[in-house]
Amino acid sequence: MKILLAIALMLSTVMWVSTQQPQRVHTYCGRHLARTLADLCWEAGVDKRSGAQFASYGSAWLMPYSEGRGKRGIVDECCLRPCSVDVLLSYC
């Protein structure tokens, strides 16, 4: 009985993995990068916030996190190398 359950679980896992499509990656540079990012952020309903909004809370510990993704930028991740839509959305 345990063997049948294990086989059924394994088959369902294999079928689930086979139905998952990997995200396509593209290279976005220049105006194409800017337009794609603007469209994605607009569709997601995300507005870029300034650091001044975090300062209004009076929490100094939030300021280091308001700087974004660090020294590597969107050009490093999406122009020099292909990136997915999820990576682009992380810059909204």
UniProtKB/Swiss-Prot annotation:
Keyword Disulfide bond among UniProt keywords: yes
Residues annotated as signal peptide: 1-19
Keywords in alphabetical order: Cleavage on pair of basic residues, Disulfide bond, Hormone, Pyrrolidone carboxylic acid, Secreted, Signal
A GO term for molecular function: hormone activity
The organism of origin for this protein: Bombyx mori
Function description: Brain peptide responsible for activation of prothoracic glands to produce ecdysone in insects.
Protein family per UniProt: Belongs to the insulin family.
SUPFAM superfamilies attached to this UniProt entry: Insulin-like
Residue ranges of the propeptide: 50-70
A GO-annotated cellular component: extracellular space
UniProt keyword tRNA processing present: no
Disulfides per UniProt: C29-C79, C41-C92, C78-C83
Subunit structure: Heterodimer of a B chain and an A chain linked by two disulfide bonds.
Protein name (Swiss-Prot/TrEMBL): Bombyxin A-1
InterPro entries: Bombyxin, Bombyxin_A, Insulin-like, Insulin-like_sf, Insulin_CS, Insulin_family
Subcellular location(s) per record: Secreted
Pyrrolidone carboxylic acid: residues carrying this PTM: Q20
Segments traversing the membrane: none
Domain of life: Eukaryota
Note: Silk worm has two kinds of PTTH: 4K-PTTH and 22K-PTTH; there are many forms of 4K-PTTH.
